[in-house]
Amino acid sequence: MADYKHTLNLPQTDFPMRGNLAQREPEQLRWWQEHEIYRKQREAFADCPTFMLHDGPPYANGQIHVGHALNKTLKDIIIKSRHLLGYNSPYVPGWDCHGLPIEQKVEQKIGKPNQKVSATEFRAACRRYAAEQVALQKDGFMRLGIFGFWDQPYLTMNFETEAQIVRALRDIVAAGHVTQGFKPINWCFDCASSLAEAEVEYQDKTSYSIDVAFAVKDVAALAKIMHADVVPAAVDVVIWTTTPWTLPANVAVSIHPEFYYVLVEIEGWYCVVAEELIPALKSRWKKSADWRICGRALGKDLDRLTLRHPFIDRDVLLINGTHVTLDAGTGCVHTAPAHGVEDYDVCQQYGIDLIHCVLGNGLYNDDTPHFAGQHIFAAEPQIIELLQTQNRLIAVEKITHSYPHCWRHKTPTIYRATTQWFISMDKAGLRQKALDGLNEVAFTPDWGKPRLLNMIAHRPDWCISRQRYWGVPLCFVVDKQTGQLHPDIVNIMDKAASAIEQKGVEAWYELSLDTLLSGKEVDRYEKLNDVLDVWFDSGTTHYSVLKKRAELSYPADLYLEGSDQHRGWFHSSLLTASAITGKPPYKALLTHGFTVDEDGRKMSKSLGNVVDPNQVIKTLGADILRLWVASADYTAEVSLSPNILNQRADAYRRMRNTCRFLLANLHDFDPEKNSVAYEKLLPLDRYVIAVAHDLQEKIKKLYVSYDFHLIYQEIFNFCSVMLGGFYLDVIKDRQYTVAQNALARRSAQTAIFHIIEAMVRWLAPILSFTAEEIWRYLPGKREESVFLTKFYEGLQPLNDDFLSMHDWELLLQLREKVNAALEKARNQGIIGGSLEAMVVLHLPPQEYEIAARFEQELRFILIVSAVNVQPSAALSIEVQHAIGEKCERCWHYLPDVGTDHQHPTLCKRCIENVDGGGELRRFA
């Protein structure tokens, strides 16, 4: 028996079947670096329109985690896809380098500043630690295949950036947005510092819930106002609070001017509460006796009556406040302006001074009656006991409620009045500027817009000062007596910024006043050593980075971060840019969700469900992690687990093997010599090119709309269904059996070439390592790297008279029905493989016309040995065993096998392909 294997055009390629990504990817990284691909990309796209994605700086502390991997990979996918779309999209990665977490790490190593080491030594150690962390994270990000200016990142601790941060504050001061105030702000005892809104998170806390009686001083006046039917000997206004520790600071009780309040008698005791809350109070106070209403009045009529503090010799004013609600409590609100923003605001209206009795470490100061020197939380049981002793406690219980906690220490915070510097939301119209600007910003997903608008509309002034060591100094010079800024503060800050640009933040502490002021002013003024909130550092990178670096542009086209950044970087950037320019620093915001396990649980070491991206890279490779990112609907929580990663690895293998098969069928194809002109391509090949063309147009739109998970689905389905399940299966016969240079074979190779040229670009933003590997195996002259190209332009929509796209869809539907009939026949033992079959098709007019156009080549579309097409009113399919013997070369069952004595095991078609001029294929 002759061996005809040498007459077949079998696929062959050196492109590996297995990715072995963990081993190959580092080699690819080195190749990119050695060949300076990123620099060459910058040069290649320099004259293109720009697309500017500005990197929100991660904090320089610790190894990268899956949240980092998700965020950076999304950014990289966007930037690489924008290059394919013809944009110049430089990427400058950044790091947030100042702040408390770094201070804490350094304290653990060398001790607290001004105790074991000087403040100067401490700041230098912080700078070194931050640099080490940047280097660690940089290696992790680069290993993910992220392209960017890794040798020229921006760091908020770079001298030039620190100087620009001061200049940004200078401009905001000059615009009139900065104020000083003794106001209640979020305070953490463990940080010993104020906290920004973004540094506070809410967790459940168990607290005392108490109702406390405040005695009315002039009962007769109260009774008259309330038109009471009795003038009791004593009356109490009852408040409710979950912060008993704030009672020593109480100076007022607030009631709503438009709510009705009633004088109630309960078993001989008289009290005043909101009328609407009586049913709830009966239950909470457990007083089931008759509640007799003796008098009634609006809150505004009770304004400015005097009460007595329950355990301190102090008069307390009854005041009106519209912040009072009927959601809980008594309708009478305990008011301590040192410990609540609304309390502070309403007392300001009445000219009531606050009482400042809590120190920065959480202890009551020495002037606090009864509790001096005690920690506020530890003193609460004693406060409750004292209230009981004074017969002022009406009810007490413990409740669990949502309470602010420090995001770093996870410990409860308080509101505490301190002298701080603020960016005012309303003094110079900043709030309205920010709100107006947001209406011009595009949001993905769109629910981000009302969320951020609501935050801006209701946020307090921004406290920007911190009493820490490692940060950018405010560079304020103030009057020692009044605390007011020097009248020439803008020029002073200019001088300070110039010094910092040369020596870093240390320059501020080394600057003497006489270098900033004239001689006669030195004794009157002093420098402040407060540093800026780190959210101001990152929130001004639009000023210190985008506007400063020549390769970047302003405003940014896109900011992309996790959904928590509505209250963080998106927020602070909006406020600073609006304060400086009156407009947002970005045209669009995109947010992604947090990573959770496959059961939707937050990742934590205690649950054992943390996925380390570095470990994934070492085992599966970065491209699998990148594919996970692309496949996820990032607008919600993003699930990750070993099981999910294994599923993505399976999908990767499908796509890789599809590309390998395409490459293997191009082993002898030179696109310059062997390409077939479009009009000479077989209809099937024109069709698959059209499918790829339409898919590419869809993929372009999906990249623009950031719907990467849909791109993943489209490419995977194209590989699995259109190529693996149809086209590549159909053309195997043509590829393998016809003559090497036959038009039919070169036609298929031309289509394959166009498809892989397009597909490698579709994949490049997602599977960056694999796409570059594929690129090197493609035939023909080309750019050095896939990342130096744009989307492939060699695809065409369908443009012939043979079949329309709709006709092809009907044919594929018919093919599915034939496959189902073949499977049924296989199960019945009529046939084994599909090539053992002859199919008789009874087709309605439309399907009959389509099928008949293929004549005898329809069998290749259906992958059977024979087809008989008959017109019919209704569609039906018969499957019979094909007549004849199996051809040794093409495996078709045909009657003419054995009719040639020189090739007794071949069919006539194969004999023609081996010895003759080759078969003629016209359609498939």
UniProtKB/Swiss-Prot annotation:
InterPro entries: aa-tRNA-synth_I_CS, aa-tRNA-synth_Ia, Anticodon_Ile_BEm, Ile-tRNA-ligase, Ile-tRNA-ligase_type1, Ile-tRNA_ligase, M/V/L/I-tRNA-synth_anticd-bd, Rossmann-like_a/b/a_fold
Cofactor(s) needed for function: Zn(2+)
Amino acids binding ATP: 605
Major site of localization recorded for this protein: cytoplasm
Gene3D superfamilies per record: 1.10.730.20, HUPs, Valyl/Leucyl/Isoleucyl-tRNA synthetase, editing domain
Biological processes per GO annotation: isoleucyl-tRNA aminoacylation
One Gene Ontology cellular component: cytosol
GO terms for MF: aminoacyl-tRNA deacylase activity; ATP binding; isoleucine-tRNA ligase activity; tRNA binding; zinc ion binding
Enzyme class: ligase
Record text about domains: IleRS has two distinct active sites: one for aminoacylation and one for editing. The misactivated valine is translocated from the active site to the editing site, which sterically excludes the correctly activated isoleucine. The single editing site contains two valyl binding pockets, one specific for each substrate (Val-AMP or Val-tRNA(Ile)).
Family: Belongs to the class-I aminoacyl-tRNA synthetase family. IleS type 1 subfamily.
Subunit composition and interactions: Monomer.
The protein's name: Isoleucine--tRNA ligase
Organism: Dichelobacter nodosus (strain VCS1703A)
